[in-house]
Structure formats: C-alpha cells, structure tokens
Amino acid sequence: MLAVNGGRFRFDADLLADLAPPVWPEALLVRAQGQVADVIGSYLHLPGPHRPQGARGCVLGLHRSGEAIGISAGTDRAAADVIAWICAVSKVPQPHEPGHVLLLDWMPDPLPMSASMPAEELLRLRRMLRSSFFTGDHPE
C-alpha cells in the first residue's frame, strides 16, 4: 500500500487511469460498488501477460480520499514496476516534504518514497528483506 503521510498531497485516480493505457494497453478503471465504495473509489486493473501461467498483473484499490492506494500484484516485479510508475507520474513529494508517501508492507518499516525511486531499488530492498541478515539465519 502507498499511503500519504499528512500534508496536502493526494493521489489522482483519474490521472492514473488516463496515463495507464500507454503502459498497460488493456488497463481498465472500474468504479467500486457496495459498502467498499465508502472507502475505495475505484479499482484500476493493469493486466499482466496473457499466456499460460503468466503473471496476473496488478489491481490498484484507489482510495476515495486520494490518501492511499492498495496494490495487489502477481509478482514482486509487477508490484515494483507499478509502484515506481505511480510515484513517478503522481510526482509524489520528497521524503522530507509534508505529504510525503510511504510504502507499507514491503519492508518491516514504512519506506519513504520519491518520484525517482526506480523499480530495481524496490526489488533490491525486497531481496535484502528475504536475505539471512533479516531472517536471523546467521552462520555461527
């Protein structure tokens, strides 16, 4: 999940929906319905490759307030690509600025994001998390 940490910055669901098709030609914005619509304004489906056992792509839950985006992805690579893209096109504030954006559930602690954070850096941090340094499996 990407979440705004105070300040005035908000994610723009319409902007993301407008900018997604050049990257994901089959992108589809679906308005949320029912009780979930109290929190989620819409879902942006970003399909993955259409092949047997292909990654399922990503689904973004765009919070009505613009303060958060839930991310469900088929692979870490797909998630990292989408997270980096969202931060770049949304021009998120720098980590030291009011309204900066945090990536939750990627590392043990919230990760401050910037508009220039590449997907490769997100994947490197994810690999570090899974290394023996973080799991406590240290050779004696």
What do the predicted segments below correspond to?
Residues 2-3, 37, 53, 95:
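Compositionally biased, low-complexity repeat tracts
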Residues 47-140:
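Charged interaction segments
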Residues 4-5, 32, 39, 59, ...:
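Intrinsically disordered, low-complexity segments enriched in small/polar residues
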Residues 1-31, 137-140:
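Short, extreme N-terminal segment that most often corresponds to the first beta-strand
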Residues 11-13, 45, 102:
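Intrinsically disordered, low-complexity regions enriched in small/polar residues
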Residues 18-52:
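Surface-exposed, low-hydrophobicity interaction/linker segments
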Residues 4-6, 11-14, 41, 57, ...:
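N-terminal functional modules and adjacent low-complexity/disordered segments of proteins
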